[in-house]
Amino acid sequence: MSINRSIADLLRSHATIPTAAAAAAPGANLLINGAFTVAQRGTSFDIDPNASGTDEYYTLDRWHLYAYLVDADYTVTQETLTPGTDEPYDHGFRHSIKVNCDVASASPGATDTLALAQKLEGQNVQSLAYGDAQAKSSTVSFWHKHTKTGTHCVTILRSGGYGWASKQYTQTTTNTWEFATVTIPANTANIPANTNAAALDIQFGISVGSTYTSGSEAAWGSVNGNYFPGQVNNMDNTSNNFEIAGVKWELGSEATTYIHEDYGTTLQKCLRYFWDPLQGGGDTTISDGGQTATTTVEATIQYPVRMRAAPTFTLVDTGTDGDGLQIQQKSGTAAWATSAVISYSNSRMSWLRISWSGAVGAVNHVMRIYSAHANTRLQWSAEL
């Protein structure tokens, strides 16, 4: 045998042997803030759903509490994990998200639904190849600690409620951290639009009525009973908690190691959907603006990243002396804002128009806009 032939055979032989590193290569996470590190809105949320309709309460960045026809009260918190007590800590996680039952609902209505959820843009889920014969299966892995033992569900929902696939996992021991992996079957029938609109939701069932729990695990479909099959009621007692950490959704039928991002990288991803430049910090200059009247100033606000779409704007905690948004002239004369609205907005910037009572300054004067209190919030939202 020639030397060249021997080398060629050796190379071919070597190429067919998968290395351990390749076999264990971690997959990219389709979810954002799966480690629950970013919390621009705050770290604790008291939630009282409207029992007559659908509510989505955003909590830690990218995560919301989905409540449909639910009539009970909850507190959602970012928890700090501790070594020696919380097992996810040993795997690099420092935070979790917890839903605490404040007012119990022992018997939810037949179609009541309470779930912890995240929505994904269509252009971010194209790697699943849904709607094609080569569609990919995927795996969700996470840590869970629930007071209520028994069957729980992870559901992948086509946004708008047009079909779902649900998989079960079990909480074996009450209030104990356990690790779960579930494999989501490929969807060969439905193509998610390749746009910035919502295409898929991941939902962790918390409390669900009998209409949606009476079935069994199944491939993609729209049978009501298979939405959260066998889901226990985590909110039937005020002593109950529902807590998860380290959530990863990736391509393939096996879970791989969670890829921990630096905080800045995760924050940049979150800013596409929500931005609060204050985040509870007082005495913060926001921008300078030009007066358009003696009671109005306009400022151009440039977002730190391009947002998913033109955002909505909300000003929180304003209008009381010493507690809110303040406008100040160079001379020191100041006024407290009574309103703030967007007069124009796109995905890169907005014009913020701020008004106050009582004439201060004059047209074309420059005014400084700043927060004078830790409770002041300026919130731009382009959530799905």
Report the location of each language-model feature.
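Extracellular and organelle-lumenal recognition/adhesion modules and their flexible linkers in secreted
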Residues: 3-384
